Structure formats: C-alpha cells, structure tokens
Amino acid sequence: MKLIAGLGNPGKKYDQTKHNTGFMALDHYLSKNNLDLDKDKFEGLWTKQKVNGEDVIFLEPQTFMNDSGKSIAQVANFFKIAPEDILVIHDDMDMPIGKIRIRANGKSGGHNGIKSIMACLGTNNFNRLKIGIRHPQKESVVSWVLSPFNDEQQKLMDAAFEVSENIINDFIKGKNAQYLMNQYN
C-alpha cells in the first residue's frame, strides 16, 4: 500500500496560494483520474483507491502545514504503511517556480510541514516530491507563500503538475526513489 500526501493549509483563505502547492498538485492528479477525497478522518481529507493494481491512500492533511505530520502518521500507522511507501508533495522556496525535485530522505530544508512529518514518523526516510515556488524578492516570506501565483507563474506550475502526475503514477507502479530521481531530477 502507498500513501501520497499533498501538503497545504485548509480553508478558502489559503486556496491557490503558493504554500498550497502540494494540495494543488494532488488535486490535479485526482481530477485527471476522476478521484475525490471522500473521507474526513485522521485529521485529513482522504480516499483509498486501487490504482494500477496497488492500494493507494491519497491524503490532504487538514491540520495546517506546521502540523501535517499528525495526519500523515495517523494514516501510516492505521494502514501500516512503511515510510518508504510514502510520497509527500510540497512547495520548496529554494527552487525556481515550477522546478521539480525528488528526494528519498534528508533534512527538512527549513520546511515546517516536513519537520512535523519527520517528528511524527520518527524518521526522515520518506519520499518527497518538491515543487519550486522560489524565494520572495521583496515581500516577506509569509506574504509570499500565502499569495497566489500570477498568470506567468501559474503556467509554470501547471506544467509542473503535469510532470507530478507522471511521478505519482511511477511511484504507485513501484518505481523506487533512485529511478524517480534519475528520471525526473
């Protein structure tokens, strides 16, 4: 069984903001595959589906970004999903807008959602699909991550969401992190 989690903040106020890139990428995948997050439990919206013969949980934690680990750990523990079978999709300010990078483990890179997941799972050995939103140029970090993409930026993000769909499918098919890194980084 696989767990694919998109990170973001719940509520209309945060819809389409840069910090909700994980939600947007997962929503793109779900929409393209006619799937819905139809359950509300484990402090998140989720669904369990069979994709390419594999049982997959798709999850959007509703705990706010900084506590994302609570929801992910609850799902992983309940369904007995190993950390290496988890893929977390999130924004990354250290990469240009729309750039994608896969990581198999490592540090949080200052991302509070990833810090929370590490603390709650007790390991950093889970997969990440990072999508760049770049550092702010003039505005504060908070203002930047909580603002929407402009039209030009959104085109880059839409292209990234298309690539992320392929990455998610390859992950579900059992392609390991090394393969994904070689293919997409």
Swiss-Prot record:
As recorded in UniProt, its EC number(s) are 3.1.1.29
UniProt-recorded name of the protein: Peptidyl-tRNA hydrolase
Which residues carry out catalysis?
Answer: H19
Domain of life (superkingdom): Bacteria
Summary of the function given for this chain in its UniProt record:
Hydrolyzes ribosome-free peptidyl-tRNAs (with 1 or more amino acids incorporated), which drop off the ribosome during protein synthesis, or as a result of ribosome stalling. Catalyzes the release of premature peptidyl moieties from peptidyl-tRNA molecules trapped in stalled 50S ribosomal subunits, and thus maintains levels of free tRNAs and 50S ribosomes.
Keywords, A to Z, come to: Cytoplasm, Hydrolase, RNA-binding, tRNA-binding
Subcellular location, principal:
cytoplasm
Would I find Signal among this entry's keywords? no
Q: Known InterPro entries for this protein?
A: Pept_tRNA_hydro, Pept_tRNA_hydro_CS, Pept_tRNA_hydro_sf
- The species is Lactobacillus gasseri (strain ATCC 33323 / DSM 20243 / BCRC 14619 / CIP 102991 / JCM 1131 / KCTC 3163 / NCIMB 11718 / NCTC 13722 / AM63)
Q: Where is this site: Stabilizes the basic form of H active site to accept a proton?
A: D91
Q: Which residues bind tRNA?
A: Y14, F64, N66, N112
On whether Glycoprotein is a keyword of this UniProt record, the answer is: no
Q: Name one GO molecular function term.
A: peptidyl-tRNA hydrolase activity
